[in-house]
Every structure is written in structure tokens, then in C-alpha cells.
């Protein structure tokens, strides 16, 4: 609890030596004037503050400064052409995979066809075909 009291005392002592307002020349914004209250968010505060702080040279109104985060800076972003080969390689891999699957399926179908042709025939087709044995 003692540290809290020491901290409060340090804050009070430090606030005595701080400046009450920034110097007039350090901020280059428009001074507060009742005729400039165009911002809807500051309109309710202007009437009560204008008579009280109008003579204070350090109080400024930020109504003319844009509050829109979409506005951004005036810097134009250069759009460089994208030279990524990720998507074309992905497409080629997919097509290669489909082609390999198609070939494998046709070879399996041919092996099945040869196997079914060899069933029940005891003549010169007695040995299973070489192609069918290769793919199982």
C-alpha cells in the first residue's frame, strides 16, 4: 500500500512542473472559432466551450482534419505485375494427377478385361495374360 501513496505523491509533484499547454507555434492547426463547428461530433461541445476557452491560444479545433481511415495518404501505390508461378504450377500438378489417374484407370480396366477373357477358357489362353499379371 505504501508504493501506491509514493506513486500518487510522485504524480502530483510531477504535474506541478509540467506545462499546461503546448507552445502556440508548435502546432500548425486552426484555432478554435465558433463559426467553424461543421463536424457533427463536435457540434454539441462547441456551444459550451466557445465562450469559456475562446481566448485560450493553445486550444485548437480538429474539425477540418479528416477522420476517415479510408482516405489514407496521397501516396500512390505502384502495382507491379505479379510474377508468381504458384497458381500455374498448381494447375499443372492437378492436370498431371488427373492424367495419371486416367491412365491407371484405363490400365486397370484392360487388366480386368483380360482376366475376364481368360476365365473358363482352357485352350491356348490357359496362362493369364502378361499385361494382367503386371498391374496387380
UniProtKB/Swiss-Prot annotation:
Does the record bear Mitochondrion in its keywords?
no
Q: Which SMART domains match?
A: CRF
Isoleucine amide modified-residue sites: 119
Q: Propeptide ranges, please?
A: 27-76, 123-136
Query: Any idea which GO molecular function terms this record carries?
Result: diuretic hormone activity
Instruction: Mention one GO biological process in which this protein takes part, according to its record.
Output: body fluid secretion
What keywords appear on the UniProt entry?
Answer: Amidation, Cleavage on pair of basic residues, Hormone, Secreted, Signal
What span is annotated as the signal peptide, if there is one?
Answer: 1-26
Q: Among the entry's GO cellular component annotations, what is one? A: extracellular region
Location comes to:
Secreted
The cross-references to InterPro entries, in alphabetical order and at most eight, read: Corticotropin-releasing_fac_CS, CRF
Keyword Translocase carried by entry: no
* Purpose: Regulation of fluid secretion.
Concerning its family, UniProt says: Belongs to the sauvagine/corticotropin-releasing factor/urotensin I family.
Protein name according to UniProt: Diuretic hormone 41
Q: What is the lineage of its organism?
A: Eukaryota, Metazoa, Ecdysozoa, Arthropoda, Hexapoda
Per UniProt, what is the name of the gene that codes for the protein in this document? Answer: dh41
Amino acid at each position: 500500500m505504501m508504493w501506491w501513496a509514493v506513486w500518487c505523491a510522485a504524480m502530483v509533484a510531477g504535474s506541478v512542473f509540467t506545462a499546461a499547454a503546448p507552445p502556440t507555434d508548435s502546432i500548425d492547426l486552426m484555432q478554435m472559432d465558433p463559426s467553424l463547428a461543421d463536424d457533427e461530433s463536435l457540434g454539441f461541445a462547441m456551444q459550451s466551450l466557445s465562450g469559456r476557452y475562446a481566448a485560450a491560444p493553445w486550444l485548437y479545433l480538429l474539425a477540418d482534419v479528416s477522420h476517415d481511415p479510408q482516405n489514407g495518404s496521397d501516396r500512390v501505390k505502384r502495382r507491379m505485375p505479379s510474377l508468381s508461378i504458384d497458381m500455374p504450377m498448381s494447375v499443372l500438378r492437378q492436370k498431371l494427377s488427373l492424367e495419371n489417374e486416367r491412365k491407371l484407370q484405363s490400365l486397370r480396366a484392360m487388366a480386368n478385361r483380360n482376366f475376364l477373357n481368360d476365365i473358363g477358357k482352357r485352350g491356348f489362353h490357359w496362362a493369364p495374360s502378361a499385361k494382367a499379371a503386371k498391374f496387380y
